[in-house]
Regions:
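General small-molecule cofactor/ligand-binding pocket signal
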Residues: 33-37, 163-165
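Periplasmic-binding protein-like
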Residues: 168-183
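N-terminal winged-helix
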Residues: 1-26, 31
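C-terminal regulatory
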Residues: 67-143, 148-172, 191, 195-207
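Short, well-ordered beta-strand segments
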Residues: 1-6, 54, 106, 146, ...
Length: 207
């Protein structure tokens, strides 16, 4: 059972499909069960044995889990078409984090890089979502600002439904990790899948 944080399939840096292909070539008789879940659910599921492997954005490390860095993504702050900042000129855009306090913010409702940053810069959270889809829906309402992965928001931007707010200023990078339970040691099939994940995300050799 593999559990993945949502909206990773559209990330060009994520090679989870390639890892699955590698694993199936090595272990064709093993059935895979793929789940999409929030970060806290994945961590808890790996710890209690519901999931053998998880793929999550990095935040607070747990000594009960082992972490293998795989890929990253860039998060930008977006507004919807009906938001006052959507049509604002560059000069009218907020210049720093403090200037965002005047606007309602939609954030993830569990411990994550999203929540940590929002608390650190004291954004005015007035709506809570529990996955990227719900955050996108709240932003599209035009009532809230919120962070989304650039690869997920790209189609909405092309359609003219979302706009990044001061992308050079209001952004952060997020690393994703493969996680397994530290103890007891994972089964051989789990370790084999973890090795396939690492291999699929290894930078190509320059030789």
């Amino acid at each position: 059972h593999l559990a993945v944080f949502d909206k990773t399939a559209s990330n060009p840096q994520a090679h989870i499909g390639e890892a699955i292909a590698l694993f199936q070539a090595q272990a064709p008789d093993v059935s895979l069960h793929l789940h999409v879940a929030p970060l806290n659910v994945i961590e808890r599921g790996v710890l209690d044995g519901q999931f053998q492997v998880g793929i999550v954005p990095g935040h607070r490390a747990s000594s009960a889990l082992t972490y293998d860095e795989l890929f990253s993504e860039t998060m930008y702050l977006y507004c919807g078409q009906a938001h006052p900042l959507f049509g604002a000129s560059a000069a009218q855009q907020p210049a720093d984090w403090a200037a965002l306090h005047a606007y309602a913010f939609a954030g993830l409702g569990y411990h994550s890089p999203n929540m940590e940053l929002a608390q650190q810069v004291q954004l005015t959270r007035q709506a809570t979502g529990y996955d990227q889809e719900s955050i996108a829906t709240l932003i599209l309402s035009g009532r809230y600002l919120g962070f989304l992965p650039d690869h997920y928001a790209e189609s909405f931007v092309r359609q003219g439904r979302l706009r990044a707010v001061q992308a050079p200023v209001f952004s952060y990078r997020c690393s994703f990790f493969g996680i397994v339970r530290a103890s007891p040691q994972a089964a051989r099939v789990t370790l084999a899948f973890q090795a396939c994940l690492s291999a699929a995300h290894r930078p190509p050799s320059s030789v």
